[in-house]
Regions:
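P-loop NTPase catalytic core
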Residues: 1-159
Length: 160
């Protein structure tokens, strides 16, 4: 598919025949990750399809690294992904019957809002809006020292 304003989407379907058994074909694209791949998955907590930040991270980072966006962009992105990873760990603890800490519970609540407000494919925000929403989520669920972002950026953006 070619887009009028530039860019394209190319899909190449691949099927793996495990052991050559044609009766058990497995659709597979894991061995064919290409430039520009964004990994989508259904988030069971919010019931929407999201851009999976863990599997899409290199593609998402290339939109930030060395680019002219807001000076807080790289640190906000790194903190958000780290907190989202902490939530994934907390979810694993919960599913395995371990007690959750207050921090674990806050990361789970953060992850739900983060997925719904930023990662869901029905979200359409520009970079400034995305950063502002993320700062709002940080200040809603965490203390400034928990997000591990430079103090000057926290002072400029926290709770605004």
């Amino acid at each position: 598919v070619q887009f009028p304003a530039g860019g394209s989407i190319t899909i190449i379907a691949v099927t793996t025949l495990s052991g050559g058994d044609i009766t058990h074909a497995v659709p597979d694209n894991t061995g064919y990750i290409t430039e520009g791949q964004l990994f989508l998955r259904r988030d069971s907590d919010i019931g929407k399809v999201i851009v999976d930040p863990f599997r899409s991270l290199s593609r998402l980072k290339q939109l930030v690294s060395g680019k002219k966006t807001r000076k807080d962009h790289p640190q906000v992105m790194n903190a958000a992904v780290r907190l989202y990873a902490d939530a994934a760990n907390a979810k694993t603890k919960m599913e395995n019957g371990f007690d959750l800490t207050n921090y674990d519970e806050r990361t789970l609540a953060f992850a739900k809002d983060y997925a719904n407000q930023l990662l869901a494919i029905d979200v359409n925000l520009d970079t400034t809006e995305m950063l502002d929403v993320t700062w709002g989520l940080f200040s809603k669920y965490f203390k400034p020292e928990e997000v591990n972002i430079k103090k000057e950026l926290v002072d400029e953006h926290w709770g605004k």
